[in-house]
């Protein structure tokens, strides 16, 4: 409504898990309230990402970002679904998520899940242009701040949108 996602549903048939959120009413997993993780920085975190298979021109800076983050976090996960990765952020299963070149239908539901679970979602510069750029960072505010400061050093100008 008016350009805002009001209701989100992400279903994982492999685990029979239904993630839901309604703006202003919180996020749930199979009826249980979700609150995202509480990591203070990147040390010991599990991060999720996807790879820009249609945006090969960004491969080098993106791999540089992954490499730099790899030295600061505990591990990476990749489900193959931005919506599910964001649902996992909302559930606290992973601490943060970042990816480039997404379409709104890839992340709109997951974005609301993260926000309703107490997290934030930004573009790669910490702004709110992710629906236009398709570049997204999500997690609790401290994790997002740490991700952004680490990523900025490696991003090409084309990704700073």
Where are these regions (language model features)?
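Acidic donor-binding loop at a coil-to-helix junction in glycosyltransferase catalytic cores
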Residues: 105
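Hydrophobic residues within well-ordered alpha-helices
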Residues: 87-90, 111-116
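Alpha-to-beta junction loops
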Residues: 91-96, 119-120
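Acidic beta-strand-loop-alpha-helix segment within the catalytic core
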Residues: 1-86, 133-161
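Short beta-strand and adjacent tight-turn residues that come in two discontinuous sequence segments
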Residues: 99
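AMP-binding (ANL) adenylation modules
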Residues: 125-130
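Small-residue (primarily alanine) positions within well-ordered alpha-helices
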Residues: 8, 110, 117-119
